[in-house]
Amino acid sequence: MRLFLSLPVLVVVLSMVLEGPTPAQGVLDVSNPFDVLEEFGKTLEDNVREFINLITQSELPAKTRDWFSEIFGK
């Protein structure tokens, strides 16, 4: 159930990251394009780490492991 909820959240976060700056934010000083890529990479890394932590802290892996143990343990 939580996986069904976390996938739409991931899609929304990725769409927010990829849509670019809003007009209120203005244009960034693009003196070095690698700085922009580095900032994007760090933001993406933080979002992915948060998503992975959310999955590992959920009950789904434990329930799945218990289910497989119950089914194949017989």
UniProtKB/Swiss-Prot annotation:
Listed GO biological process terms: lipid transport; lipoprotein metabolic process; negative regulation of cholesterol transport; negative regulation of lipid catabolic process; negative regulation of very-low-density lipoprotein particle clearance; triglyceride metabolic process; very-low-density lipoprotein particle clearance
Any one GO cellular component localisation term in the record: very-low-density lipoprotein particle
Subcellular localization(s) per the UniProt record: Secreted
Highest taxon of source: Eukaryota
One Pfam match: ApoC-I
One of the record's GO molecular function terms: phospholipase inhibitor activity
Secretion signal span: 1-26
Family the UniProt entry places it in: Belongs to the apolipoprotein C1 family.
UniProt name for this protein: Apolipoprotein C-I, acidic form
High-level lineage: Eukaryota, Metazoa, Chordata, Craniata, Vertebrata
Gene responsible for this protein: APOC1A
